[in-house]
């Protein structure tokens, strides 16, 4: 059986936490930040756990991470 390939685009966007859940970065934090208040910018800086319905898809894209 051949080795499974990792989706490199997914590998750059997700990392796996200690308890086996995928972590992602939030959107809307790259530019056009001057009209967003500090609270919103701070919240957008926090990493987010990938939703449980998408965890299975991330797991397929990163076969050796879990």
From Swiss-Prot:
The keyword Ribonucleoprotein applies. Disulfide bonds: none annotated. GO terms for biological process: translation. It comes from the Bacteria. InterPro entries: Ribosomal_bL35, Ribosomal_bL35-like, Ribosomal_bL35_CS, Ribosomal_bL35_sf. Keywords: Ribonucleoprotein, Ribosomal protein. GO terms for cellular component: cytosolic large ribosomal subunit. The keyword Electron transport does not apply. GO terms for molecular function: structural constituent of ribosome. Belongs to the bacterial ribosomal protein bL35 family. This is Large ribosomal subunit protein bL35. The gene is rpmI.
